[in-house]
């Protein structure tokens, strides 16, 4: 066990060192002229102010929960909760700061060409990715080492590492607040800016005359960068912890090694992801997306070859009971190695499937663009249809992965497949954080009045960034589905371990009631999220209209808008609106568990997983398709910018924005928090 912890801690430190080195390389690049630096400073000031206020609010909620967990469960669990929350927040805050510094340098590098701008944008994203996996693995492995150090021989591994559930809960709490609050901010700004700027005033995106333009750029950083970092930090840590707990419960021999085996897989993938980052380079005449995917493919290939010796090392002496038969030695090694391969294959499938439904190169997006030629309503109908259809292939891929992984190594096989999938988080976050960096770089170029040659570089980078953001959301949702299933397995085994053995029979009315309540939660949460964005966007619309009316000279460029007003309004709105929906997944399992019992609570867990998976995929894929349908028309198809088709596509994109960037992604942490809270309260049931 000690070897696994040492390897994980060393690999996590390597990821942090790599982040530090690339931060230095990014900061060494030119930040452009004074106008560019002024815009970047305004974006950074707004993003920092928002995150500080968000973390202050979370801190107040977290302090109350820390005391409750400490008194009701254990102080080790409470300490884990605090550690998970702090590290998750730190990953998001540091990633956001690097993103803001990378934006302006990417815009300046675009003067020199596509390859130079791509290099800085991807490095900025890679820093965030390595911070997420480095801090996540360091936190889990480091806290595990503290928990097992000095323990007496009579203590079981599962009891010793049980406080890690607190770590998972801390990361999850930050995740849902960051995803939801950041999403409300960014889409409130985006929708408000588009409705008045593009639709009413007829000015282009990122035009400095729009009073909401700085708020829009701030939102990209707090939502797409800090929000996604917190989301995948949580998914990464939760999956590793859930697999560790399951291994400690299922294995009778080699329990310690089974508990740290997921940490070793994560450690190997960090090294693989670092190497993969160096393969992201444009070839002469090549595509930007191919350069990014090359890095992902190299990382996946190296991880594949590393997993076999790691499995031999850690699981060679373990035995697992499958269908009443003891399996160990070479057979178990190959079964577990095959399970890791399932996770890597599912990663590739989720990337390919999501790109198909959200890229301008494929029929779904082109279908929405074509539907825009006949009006706003047909655009909305087509987008909703694509979003619904986009659920089929990912869900079938997840189902196939579950079937194969279960046939190989039972529930532990599913957990290992999920761990292998999530072990690629470092380079996946790099692809995602690349998106807001290129988006902001284009905005800075527009606001600073840089030459058209710069926009000719930033625009294709931004178009690819839209697809990478959609792809990583698909990956996050698919992995969240697997992670939630592993957490449900932990819940059932946790009940068994606590001598509360139960069956979840569909003929039991309590289980059915739980399924209905669990199925309701993602819909209720999604509705609250969408309505929150609508209210925030409405306030921005009124403010932008007011400034256009009351500040003469904005439209001719002789006077500047009051950018800070929209930023401050959205900050207050996002903080206010995020609290009640974010507490929903904490309160519902507690209330159901206390008043209806553990069987109904089990139904809640399964119901939330099923409906949450479908809603999240539908929203993120549909929203991404709406966005890129607009971009497809702006590229000169179906009449291009300013045409009736373009106006209809802008409406679709405006509806799709909160779909794909607020409600959809926030459902990921929602379904996992419900499961984690259920795990936490087992002793109280």
From Swiss-Prot:
The answer, when asked if Signal is one of the entry's keywords, is: no
- Residues noted as binding Mg(2+) 1 in the record, renumbered to the chain: 190, 194
**Has keyword Nucleus?**
no
Supply the enzyme class, top level.
Answer: translocase
- Give the protein's cofactors: Mg(2+)
Q: Note the site residues: Determinant of potassium independence.
A: 469
Membrane topology per the entry is: Multi-pass membrane protein
Highest taxon of the lineage:
Bacteria
Record site feature (Important for ion transport), residues: 179, 224, 231, 661, 672
Gene Ontology molecular functions: diphosphate hydrolysis-driven proton transmembrane transporter activity; inorganic diphosphate phosphatase activity; magnesium ion binding
Alphabetically sorted, this entry's keywords are: Calcium, Cell inner membrane, Cell membrane, Hydrogen ion transport, Ion transport, Magnesium, Membrane, Metal-binding, Translocase, Transmembrane, Transmembrane helix, Transport
List the EC numbers from the record. Answer: 7.1.3.1
Q: In which residues is substrate bound?
A: 187, 660
A Pfam family per the record: H_PPase
Which reactions appear under catalytic activity for this entry? diphosphate + H2O + H(+)(in) = 2 phosphate + 2 H(+)(out)
User: For Ca(2+), which residues are the binding ones?
Assistant: 627, 653, 657
Summarize where Mg(2+) 2 binds, as residue positions: 217, 220, 439
Give the matching InterPro entries.
PPase-energised_H-pump
The UniProt function text for this chain reads: Proton pump that utilizes the energy of pyrophosphate hydrolysis as the driving force for proton movement across the membrane. Generates a proton motive force.
Matching entries from NCBIfam families are given as:
PRK00733.1-2, PRK00733.2-1, PRK00733.3-5, V_PPase
- What protein family does this chain belong to? Belongs to the H(+)-translocating pyrophosphatase (TC 3.A.10) family. K(+)-insensitive subfamily.
Q: How would you summarize the oligomeric state and partners of this protein?
A: Homodimer.
Q: What is this protein called?
A: K(+)-insensitive pyrophosphate-energized proton pump
* Species annotation: Nitrosomonas europaea (strain ATCC 19718 / CIP 103999 / KCTC 2705 / NBRC 14298)
Upper lineage ranks?
Bacteria, Pseudomonadati, Pseudomonadota, Betaproteobacteria, Nitrosomonadales
Gene from which the chain derives:
hppA
């Amino acid at each position: 066990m000690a070897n696994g912890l040492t390897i994980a801690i060393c690999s996590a430190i390597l990821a942090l060192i790599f982040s530090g080195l690339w931060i230095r390389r990014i900061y060494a690049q030119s930040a452009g002229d004074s106008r560019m630096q002024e815009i970047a400073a305004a974006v950074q000031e707004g993003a920092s102010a928002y995150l500080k206020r968000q973390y202050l609010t979370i801190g107040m909620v977290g302090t109350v929960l820390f005391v409750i967990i400490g008194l009701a469960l254990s102080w080790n669990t409470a300490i884990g909760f605090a550690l998970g929350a702090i590290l998750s927040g730190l990953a998001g805050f540091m990633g956001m700061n690097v993103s803001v510094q990378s934006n302006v340098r990417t815009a300046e590098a675009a003067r020199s060409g596509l390859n130079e701008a791509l290099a800085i944008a991807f490095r900025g994203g890679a820093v965030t990715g390595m911070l997420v996996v480095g801090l996540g693995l360091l936190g889990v492995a480091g806290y595990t080492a503290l928990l097992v150090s000095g323990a007496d021989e009579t203590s079981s591994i599962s009891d010793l590492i049980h406080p890690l559930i607190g770590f998972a809960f801390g990361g999850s709490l930050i995740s849902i607040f960051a995803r939801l609050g950041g999403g409300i901010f960014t889409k409130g700004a985006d929708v408000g800016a588009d409705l008045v700027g593009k639709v009413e005033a007829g000015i282009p995106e990122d035009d400095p005359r729009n009073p909401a333009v700085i708020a829009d750029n701030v939102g990209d950083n707090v939502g797409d960068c800090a929000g996604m970092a917190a989301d995948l930090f949580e998914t990464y840590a939760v999956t590793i912890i859930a697999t560790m707990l399951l291994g400690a419960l299922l294995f009778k021999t080699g329990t310690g090694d089974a508990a740290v085996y997921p940490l070793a897989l994560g450690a190997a993938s960090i090294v693989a992801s670092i190497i993969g980052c160096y393969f992201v380079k444009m070839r002469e005449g090549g595509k930007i997306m191919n350069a990014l995917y090359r890095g992902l493919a190299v990382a996946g290939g190296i991880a594949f070859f590393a997993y076999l010796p790691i499995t031999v090392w850690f699981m060679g002496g373990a035995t697992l009971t499958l269908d009443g038969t003891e399996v160990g030695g070479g057979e178990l090694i190959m079964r577990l190695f095959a399970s890791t391969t399932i996770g890597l294959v599912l990663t590739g499938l989720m990337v390919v499937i999501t790109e198909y439904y959200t890229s301008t190169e494929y029929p779904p997006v082109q279908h929405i663009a074509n539907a825009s030629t006949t009006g706003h309503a047909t655009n909305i109908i087509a987008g909703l249809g694509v979003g619904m259809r986009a659920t089929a292939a990912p869900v079938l891929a997840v189902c196939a992965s579950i079937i194969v992984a279960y046939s190989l190594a039972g529930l532990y096989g599913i957990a290992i497949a999920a761990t292998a999938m999530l072990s690629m988080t470092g380079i996946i976050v790099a692809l995602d954080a690349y998106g807001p960096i290129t988006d902001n770089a284009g905005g800075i170029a527009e606001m600073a009045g840089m030459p058209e040659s710069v926009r000719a570089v930033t625009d294709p980078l931004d178009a690819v960034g839209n697809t990478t953001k959609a792809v990583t959301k698909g990956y996050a949702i698919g992995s969240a589905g697997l992670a939630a299933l592993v957490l449900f397995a932990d819940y059932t085994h946790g009940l068994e371990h606590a001598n509360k053995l139960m069956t979840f029979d569909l003929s039991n009315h309590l289980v059915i009631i739980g399924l209905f309540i669990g199925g309701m939660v993602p819909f209720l949460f999604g509705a609250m999220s969408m309505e929150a964005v609508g209210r925030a966007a409405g306030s921005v619309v009124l403010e932008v209209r007011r400034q256009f009316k009351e500040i003469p000279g904005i439209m001719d460029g002789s006077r500047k808008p009051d950018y800070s007003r929209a930023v401050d309004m959205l900050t207050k709105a996002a903080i206010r609106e995020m609290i009640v929906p974010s507490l929903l997944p904490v309160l519902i399992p507690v209330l159901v568990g206390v008043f209806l019992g553990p069987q109904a609570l089990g139904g809640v867990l399964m119901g939330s997983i099923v409906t949450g998976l479908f809603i999240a995929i539908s929203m993120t894929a549909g929203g991404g398709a709406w966005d890129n349908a607009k971009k497809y028309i702006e590229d000169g198809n179906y009449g291009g910018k300013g045409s009736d088709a373009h106006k209809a596509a802008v409406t679709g994109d405006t509806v799709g924005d909160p779909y794909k960037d607020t409600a959809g992604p926030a459902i990921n942490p929602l379904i996992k928090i419900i499961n984690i809270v259920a795990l936490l309260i087992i002793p109280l049931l």
